[in-house]
């Protein structure tokens, strides 16, 4: 047995032990589970034995002065992995203190501790039809990770199979009410999420404005004031321990009385940065003086209603409403406010806009509450106090030599990844009880893709072309349709998500909206016609299977 085999066995045992805790609350095994087909792997051959491995030294230096800020020698990667890929995995995802026996040093260790945990939890919760299917699942998942076909989001690599809490979700949506206890709890919850390697967003619109009175008779501070404290807290906490900075999103409704202050907040801070930079202060990203500037640790977004956008189009007035009683306390020119928003976004890229009515029209769970906010990157939108674990497919891996798109492998990859992502919710830990309860009840997933631009370039298609848009639309539709089809299949095996029954009508309505949107895709070239044909079939099956089984997941896909 080689050194790598010994390490693999030890790490698999550790990962299996971590996964065994998932057996609490375990569902009864169904009569029939998933059958998993081999696509990439060969029976009797481990994926690791099909590639050549090499040892490398990873030494990272400070670009300013050349000093070494990270060093780990003798790490092991496949010979086809780029230097950049190996550096990222070594510095970000290997666990254990550098220089100790606990430190991971091989990609095999990393993949094994994650994949073995997923397999164990899948078997415990009745996902697979047989032990053979579980073994194929493990090998296929290993092969795809080894060959960079896809990747889970960072918290999976940070936490799964370690002694740390098994936080698997990168994206969280919190809530905050108009009380000091709730505001202070917001700070605490964000800190716990950042510590686990993730990011969080929330809507501050319940907090009364600075133009309203407190019950004691004094004037309220307003949400922008409380943003300052949360921003400072995020700036001191590195996500995942020491691997990356915290990520935040703050949202404010367009009818909040403090909306103008919110819109201009970051633009004013950018003005300060320019002045301080010109005066000789170190204002680079990560510079020693940048911490003196506020609101640099969050993305800001304005939640715009259809009513507001119509007022902008018509040049009308728009009412800002008190948080305490809903009364209009100020009227503004809608077009002027929108212009300020656009100007601020032009100056500093913030705030963004979230279209509230459109978002909620595509909401699969309206009976459980409105969507009021998003995660930091704005691709995940769902109920308050929920989370979403992500995975991203590498589209270039599905481009054939003749420039066709390998739809068969793409569909199989999506099915396997969605299955793995759903399994992770069975063993995942969550930073708060409320988030854990809601996520387990709705099981939101976020499969997506990367390298669309590279795929279009390799295919000879311009971004701004009908052919490029058609291929992108067809691939996205196929991915999402396949994801929801697999979700419906899983519902038939391990049951629909807990919140499905009360939202069944709405969920099925949104699936039909997706089906109609797919029908609106206009294909241009043979490659996107082939992809779109499969997407159309997938959505037909989604509607049919969803009617029969329901769905395992309230959401399935995102695009960051």
Task: Show which residues each predicted segment covers.
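Extended catalytic cores of very large enzyme megasubunits
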Residues: 1-560
